[in-house]
Amino acid sequence: MKFKKYKIIFLDPTGHTGWLSEDELYDFDPEECVIEAYVYSKDKKFVTTFASYTTNKDTGKMEFGDANVIPTACIKSMRKIK
């Protein structure tokens, strides 16, 4: 398969709809997330990944599952998994 697997650490925007004290707001940070997936594409704006795939029996084409599009500005690190 031509796709390479990566461990990607990224910051996920986080929201809060309730009231926060000033201290809570000051300490309010995005969540740091980790994903291990195949990189489908990567450019200056986005990295598109998928974690599972299959070949459609009717068409013979690949189909992808557990797909994500991550803005590159949110990515802290990407490391290729051997």
Where in the sequence are the language-model features?
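Conserved RNA-binding domains used in RNP assembly and mRNA/RNA metabolism
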Residues: 2-82
